[in-house]
């Protein structure tokens, strides 16, 4: 894998609060190599390590995107949902930003059936088919459509398992991470000081609570994906 320059700036990361970890009582000892100090009762992440692993992640997604691979971004906490959707749409990635439905990947055949139902209902709505049904039936199907849009809207164009999954919060998305591990799908994961760095293929030490930190990390990854995709389009 070729190493590239991704303009990862330590000062920019400090301004975004990427270095702020959790309280010193709430930490995972496995994170010790990624922690540089304690300040006012919280751990401080070593941003040099963050820059290194973020750069590796950018190299990985660039190479994957340049070969036409598919990505899934997962982040379901309310405050990060919009950032996840924005990043995914910008890079033409699939995303889950509301709730991870258990078995979404490991029971792909069921997910696929739901997606077919979702697409059929969307088509019916667009063509006015739902409005021609009895009111009670139409109302029931519209509720079903709304539910599917909420939970599957970000993966509505996904036709198979993703090649790489980017996970914003290891604790919140633990089920998604375990499904990826079970299926052998490579993962890139933001890890705060209370996380386990051994669970993901590439773990990026970073504040997973501050929106500014999440956006900065996602912006770098999305830029790398977009750059890779542009190369794939030029040289299919």
Curated annotation (Swiss-Prot):
InterPro entries registered for this protein in UniProt: Ribosomal_uS2, Ribosomal_uS2_bac/mit/plastid, Ribosomal_uS2_CS, Ribosomal_uS2_flav_dom_sf
The entry's keywords: Chloroplast, Plastid, Ribonucleoprotein, Ribosomal protein
Transmembrane parts of this sequence: none
Pfam families the UniProt entry points to: Ribosomal_S2
Domain of life assignment: Eukaryota
GO MF annotation terms: structural constituent of ribosome
UniProt-listed CDD domains: RPS2 (cd01425)
Gene Ontology cellular component annotations, sorted alphabetically: chloroplast; small ribosomal subunit
Record SUPFAM superfamilies: Ribosomal protein S2 (SSF52313)
Subcellular location: Plastid, Chloroplast
GO BP of this protein: translation
Family membership noted in the UniProt record: Belongs to the universal ribosomal protein uS2 family.
PANTHER family registered for this protein in UniProt: 30S RIBOSOMAL PROTEIN S2 PROKARYOTIC AND ORGANELLAR, SMALL RIBOSOMAL SUBUNIT PROTEIN US2M
The protein's name in its UniProt record: Small ribosomal subunit protein uS2c
Source organism: Lactuca sativa (Garden lettuce)
Gene that this polypeptide is encoded by: rps2
